[in-house]
Curated annotation (Swiss-Prot):
Gene this chain is encoded by: pex12.S
Main location: membrane
Annotated CDD domains: mRING_PEX12 (cd16451)
Peroxisomal matrix-side positions: 1-19, 77-104, 179-243
BP GO terms, sorted: protein import into peroxisome matrix; protein monoubiquitination
Cytoplasmic topological domain: 48-51, 135-139, 272-353
Membrane-spanning parts: 20-47, 52-76, 105-134, 140-178, 244-271
UniProt source species: Xenopus laevis
Pathway involvement of the protein, from the record: Protein modification; protein ubiquitination
Organism lineage string: Eukaryota, Metazoa, Chordata, Craniata, Vertebrata
Keywords: Membrane, Metal-binding, Peroxisome, Protein transport, Transmembrane, Transmembrane helix, Transport, Ubl conjugation pathway, Zinc, Zinc-finger
InterPro entries: PEX12 (IPR017375), Pex_N (IPR006845)
GO molecular function, one term: zinc ion binding
Stretches annotated zinc finger (RING-type): 298-337
Name used for this protein in its record: Peroxisome assembly protein 12-A
Protein localization: Peroxisome membrane
Length: 353
């Protein structure tokens, strides 16, 4: 058994087939990029809603657009995604020799679509399921409607679909480790490619391709020159994004170290700083129509609150139904104007029930 384990961890180092640690590391790199950028945009939107609110509402679409530019640049230049190139890997057609330089057009487009669209669709599906689950928990939908039965069917089947999806990926990873499979991911199989290590010949070929592009750009027609300039501009945008992500990787490692157990004393000293005064626009007049005089009255419906619910972004308390519909429609707090999503609704349970 020990022989088998040693064989698994050492065979990949002697040939062009990457080890399981390399392929899993490159996948986790892009998986960590989206939550990190999402948190940064969230902080910006909460600090300045008027300027960054749109960026927060359309984050998934903007991130997908940047991801498309980034992956398109690296697939056309290095035959690999950004994370694969970061770890010295490239894509070749299944069954082809390791010396293959560029991906065929069919495999190129399949790789690009699977790299960009699958994560986007998965994030959107999870948001829809979470929203439907909240609506079901608090009986927001009409219990006799046809849509509610459809929602229940979706909520009942989603855990099994997710389990099947994860099991599909796990099977490919186990086959890659134990039986020397060609792919560690079914998405690579669907794209018709496999991963291999970059060689010195590949690096020299990339340099020559860049030199030839610069040489040919000086002896072409005006239309071709414009196309070349646009292509270089997109490449520059993708390169700047990739450089930012590379720096972000080291920044994430720094955050892991900063919030480790060894630095708890430092964090405690920082948390003991005095609380800053509230923003000026929070100091509303007592006669403001947004805030009723009685603390038990909902600011929206002007009735005694039912199912007290606070907004995590501002701290104001409303009826759950009032807060739910308002936040779902306007994506902001009705009193402070801070950007707010449904996940910021916090159900309150009083001691007297």
């Amino acid at each position: 058994m020990a022989e088998r384990g040693a064989h698994i961890t050492t065979t990949s180092a002697s040939d062009d087939r990457p080890s399981i640690f390399e392929v899993v590391a490159q996948e986790s790199l892009m998986a960590a990029a989206r939550p990190a950028l999402h948190h940064i945009v969230k902080v910006l939107a909460e600090s300045n809603p008027s300027r960054y609110g749109t960026l927060w509402r359309w984050f998934d679409e903007l991130y997908t657009l940047l991801d498309w530019l980034l992956q398109q640049h690296y697939l056309s230049w290095a035959s690999a995604s950004f994370s694969e190139n970061f770890y010295g890997l490239k894509r070749i057609t299944l069954g082809k020799e390791v010396g293959q330089r560029n991906l065929p057009r069919k495999e190129y487009w399949k790789s690009l679509l699977l790299l960009v669209l699958i994560p986007y669709l998965r994030v959107k599906l999870e948001k829809i399921v979470n929203r439907l689950r909240e609506e079901q928990d608090y009986s927001i939908q009409n219990p006799t409607s046809f849509h509610k039965r459809c929602y229940k069917a979706i909520l009942a089947s989603y855990p099994f679909v997710k389990l099947g999806w994860e099991a599909w990926f796990l099977f490919y990873q186990l086959r890659y480790i134990l039986w020397n499979g060609k792919n560690h991911s079914p998405l690579l199989r669907l794209a018709g490619v496999q991963l291999t290590r970059l060689t010195m010949e590949d690096l020299h070929a990339m340099e020559k391709q860049e030199e030839m592009t610069n040489t040919l750009s000086n002896a072409v027609s005006l239309s071709q020159r414009i196309r070349s300039i646009l292509k270089k501009a997109l490449g520059a945008v993708a390169l700047s994004v990739s450089s930012s992500l590379s720096l972000g990787v080291f920044f994430l490692q720094f955050l892991d170290w900063w919030y480790s157990a060894e630095n708890q004393e430092t964090l405690k000293s920082l948390n003991n700083l005095p609380v800053p005064p509230p923003p000026i626009h929070f100091e509303l007049e007592t006669y403001s129509p947004l805030l009723p005089k009685l603390k038990t009255v909902c600011p929206l419906c002007r009735k005694v609150r039912v199912n007290d619910t606070a907004l995590g972004t501002s701290g104001y308390v409303f009826c759950y139904r009032c807060a739910y519909y308002y936040v779902k429609t306007h994506q902001r707090c009705p009193v402070s104007g801070y950007p707010t999503e449904l996940q910021h609704l916090i159900k309150l349970y009083t001691p007297d029930g």
